[in-house]
C-alpha cells in the first residue's frame, strides 16, 4: 500500500469518547438482552470482556493481567497492555453497535444468529473458525438498517432482507480475508442475490440487491491495529485502503441490471491509536461502490441506502466532551526539575529515526525495561511526573530533524539551563496534553 504524503492540521482538541465504565455498561446491557432471550453468556467471551473491563476500570489498564482472563491467547500481537486494551475495545464496540440497532428493532430470526456470535474465539484477529465473526458482521450491517427505521428479516435464505415502504433490499454479506478472495466472494454474492430476489413482480414493490463486504483483512492482513498522527490522518489511512480495494474490484462484474444489484458496501472495522493527542479509537469506515448502469433508474433506492449510513446517529449522550490541548505550562513556585546527566547521549540515541520503529518492535520485557529508564522528571506541588526513554523517543519522533539537531547542540552546552527546562516542559506537554493545574491543588 502506498504511503500517504498529505499534510494535516495539528490537532487542537481531543475526540469525544466513552469511558471504560460506559463500555462495561454496554456489555452488561448486552448480557441482559441476551439472557432475556434465553442465551447464556456465562464463561463466554462476553463474560471475559466484562471481567477485563472491570479490572481496567478499578485498577487501570496497565494493572490488568489479561493472560489470566484470556488464557488461550498466545499470539505475538498481544504483548503490551495497550495491545490487549485496543483488541478488547474492537470487540466491545462492535457488540455495542449491534445492540444499539437491536434496541430499536428486533428482526425476525435474530436469536439463532445471536447464539452463534456468543461463541467463537475471544478476538477476531485469532478466529480460525470464521462462522461466528461472519454472523457478527451480518448483525453489524443489520444494525445500521434497524437504526434507520427499516423492517429487517434474518429468517430467510438471504443474509439480510431490509424493507422500507415498497423498497426491499436483499443484502449478502461477505468477510474476505485476502485480496485473492475478492473476485470469488463478490461473484458468489451476486449469484446468491440473483437466485433469491423475487422474480415475480408485485404491484408497488421494488427489489434491489446489495453486497456488503468486510475487507479489514484485505487492507490489514494482520487484522490488528492501525495508527495515525492525528484523527484526520487516521481516518485518511483507512479511507485510502478502501479506495485501493475499490480500484481492485473495478474489473469484477459483480453488478447486474435485472434484478438490479445497485451497490457494493465496503467496510473496514479496526482499532488503533492517534498520536496527537494520544487516544485510542475504534473505527467503522465505509466506502460505497455504485452500479452506474442503474444509478439513474434506482436513484430513490440509492438515496434510501445513503441515509442508512449517512443519516445514522452514532453520537452517545454519555460521551465525555473533547478537551483542549495545552500549548504552555506554568510552573508554580517550588517546582522541582531534574534531568539525567547523560541527557546528551540519550538525546543522540532517542533522536535516531530508527529508535521509534525499534521500540515498537520490542518484546514485552524489552519494552518494560526501556520504560523504566528515566531521563528526567518534574515535581509540581508535591506530585511527581517522570519521563522515560520511551517518552523522549516518542516526543522527538514528532519533531523535524533540524529541531532535534539544534536541541542536541544546545543540551551539549553544560550551562544551558534554559534549554533543559524547555525540554522538560515539552516532554510534560507531550505526555500530559490535557494537564489541569487545579488537579494538583
For each feature predicted by the language model, list its residue ranges.
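Residue-level marker of positions within ordered structural domains that often coincide
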Residues: 150, 176, 216
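Conserved catalytic cores of phosphodiester-cleaving nucleases, focusing on short active-site segments
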Residues: 145, 160-162, 168-177
Amino acid at each position: 500500500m502506498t504511503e500517504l504524503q498529505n499534510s494535516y492540521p495539528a490537532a487542537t482538541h481531543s475526540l469525544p469518547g466513552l469511558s471504560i465504565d460506559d463500555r462495561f455498561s454496554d456489555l452488561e446491557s448486552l448480557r441482559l438482552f441476551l439472557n432475556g432471550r434465553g442465551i447464556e453468556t456465562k464463561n463466554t467471551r462476553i463474560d471475559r470482556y466484562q471481567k477485563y473491563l472491570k479490572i481496567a476500570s478499578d485498577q487501570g489498564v496497565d494493572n490488568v493481567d489479561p493472560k489470566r482472563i484470556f488464557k488461550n491467547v498466545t499470539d505475538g500481537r498481544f504483548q503490551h497492555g495497550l495491545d490487549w486494551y485496543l483488541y478488547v475495545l474492537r470487540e466491545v464496540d462492535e457488540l455495542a453497535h449491534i445492540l444499539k440497532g437491536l434496541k430499536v428493532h428486533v428482526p425476525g430470526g435474530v436469536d439463532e444468529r445471536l447464539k452463534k456470535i456468543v461463541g467463537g474465539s475471544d478476538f477476531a484477529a485469532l478466529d480460525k473458525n470464521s462462522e461466528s465473526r461472519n454472523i457478527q458482521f451480518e448483525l453489524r450491517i443489520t444494525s445500521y438498517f434497524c437504526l434507520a427505521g427499516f423492517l429487517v428479516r434474518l429468517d430467510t435464505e438471504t443474509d439480510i432482507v431490509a424493507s422500507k415502504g415498497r423498497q426491499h433490499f436483499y443484502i449478502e454479506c461477505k468477510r474476505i480475508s485476502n485480496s485473492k478472495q475478492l473476485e470469488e466472494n463478490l461473484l458468489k454474492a451476486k449469484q446468491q442475490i440473483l437466485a433469491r430476489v423475487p422474480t415475480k413482480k408485485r404491484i408497488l414493490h421494488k427489489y434491489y440487491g446489495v453486497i456488503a463486504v468486510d475487507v479489514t483483512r484485505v487492507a490489514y492482513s494482520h487484522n490488528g491495529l492501525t495508527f495515525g498522527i492525528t484523527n484526520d490522518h487516521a481516518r485518511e489511512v483507512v479511507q485510502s485502503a478502501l479506495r485501493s480495494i475499490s480500484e481492485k474490484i473495478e474489473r469484477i462484474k459483480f453488478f447486474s441490471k435485472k434484478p438490479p444489484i445497485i451497490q457494493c458496501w465496503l467496510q473496514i472495522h479496526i482499532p488503533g491509536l492517534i498520536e496527537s493527542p494520544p487516544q485510542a479509537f475504534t473505527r467503522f469506515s465505509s466506502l460505497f461502490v455504485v452500479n452506474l448502469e442503474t444509478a439513474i433508474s434506482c436513484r430513490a433506492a440509492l438515496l434510501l441506502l445513503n441515509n442508512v449510513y449517512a443519516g445514522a446517529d452514532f453520537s452517545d449522550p454519555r460521551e465525555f466532551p473533547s478537551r483542549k490541548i495545552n500549548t504552555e505550562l506554568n510552573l508554580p513556585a517550588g517546582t522541582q526539575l531534574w534531568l539525567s546527566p547523560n541527557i546528551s547521549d540519550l538525546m543522540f540515541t532517542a533522536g535516531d529515526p530508527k529508535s521509534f520503529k525499534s521500540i515498537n518492535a520490542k518484546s514485552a520485557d524489552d519494552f518494560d525495561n526501556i520504560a523504566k529508564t528515566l531521563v528526567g522528571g518534574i515535581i509540581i506541588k508535591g506530585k511527581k511526573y517522570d519521563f522515560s526513554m520511551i517518552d523522549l523517543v516518542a516526543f522527538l519522533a514528532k519533531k523535524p530533524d533540524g529541531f532535534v539537531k539544534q536541541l542536541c547542540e544546545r543540551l551539549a552546552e553544560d550551562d544551558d539551563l534554559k534549554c533543559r527546562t524547555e525540554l522538560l516542559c515539552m516532554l510534560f506537554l507531550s505526555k500530559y496534553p490535557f494537564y489541569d493545574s487545579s488537579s494538583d491543588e
